[in-house]
Amino acid sequence: MNAITMPDIIGYNRRRFLRNMANTVAAAGFATVAFADDESDMNTTTMATAKPGSHTSFRSLKQIDAGVLNIGYVEDGPADGPVVILLHGWPYDIYSYVDVAPVLAAAGYRVIVPYVRGYGTTTFLSSEAMRNGQPSAVALDTIALMDALKIPKAVIAGFDWGARTGCIIAALWPERCKALVSVSGYLIGGQAAGRKPLPPQAELQWWYQFYFATERGRAGYDKYRHDFAKLIWKIASPKWNFDDATFERSAASLDNPDHVAIAIHNYRWRLDLAEGEPKYDDWEKRLAEAPVINVPTITMEGDANGAPHPDAAAYAKKFSGRYAHRLITGGIGHNLPQEAPQSFADAVKEVDSYS
């Protein structure tokens, strides 16, 4: 009898997960057209508004090989429209943009919403690849996706990990970023910054990062990943009364077999408790210098964001191009695009007009 190797296990888990995701996708209605198909509707901006929770599905789910990954993504809007890429964070997924995408598509944008590595149907092409959560590695996934889709330049918008990726692309590859929308502002950092202790109240907000630094934390997150994610959602958005169906649509993406490894590596790497890959060293050195972002930018913040986030006044000077900051009121928390989709879509359209 042949010995079972780690690649065998990874391959089995990957196949099983993809089968389960396919069933989830079908149940969620990806194959159902949730947006207006009429061309006149697609070109009408005055009729398109985004009410939180008004959509529960996307037009379609696609897959494409890009860099080290096979990336799952949804796409809507005219194929020849200006491109906007919407990037989700942890522990969320593409459904953060389920109400944003139709508004932008109706305004004429080609909207791309990818699953980040370790989420949904995005998987590694090689079972031997390091499950790396370094910020530069995650950002380069988006560059690889743009290359695979032959997108030379796009408006990039995101929150949480997605905002960090947007900031990194705008700073290191400004020729690929037409404009930026970043929830919680300038999120570029490095391991040196992660080694510096913060005041106790600030450290308390990062409790999960310290939990993940332990093997107990890794095991606990793996065992209770849905419960853990729901807790984070509630802490980060204390006034958002999301229902179980809304949560479970996104939580299914966390069952990706690479999810725990990538999330744990990301937070350990930030504290300099895990090594990265040498091929990213030069990029991380540049990011550690906190480069200024020159592309047109709108930063956003919800008035009830319960997640750790910097003060807007502290990072405004990091944006040297045309810049605006928007505080969104009404009890809006960390998952701003899902909680205030119209405000987020408006910011994308506004920042696009800056360039």
Describe every region a protein language model picked out.
Residues 62-66:
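Short acidic-hydrophobic surface loop/beta-edge motif
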Residues 347-355:
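C-terminal alpha-helix
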Residues 76-123:
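Conserved HGGG/HGGXW glycine-rich cap/lid loop of the alpha/beta-hydrolase fold
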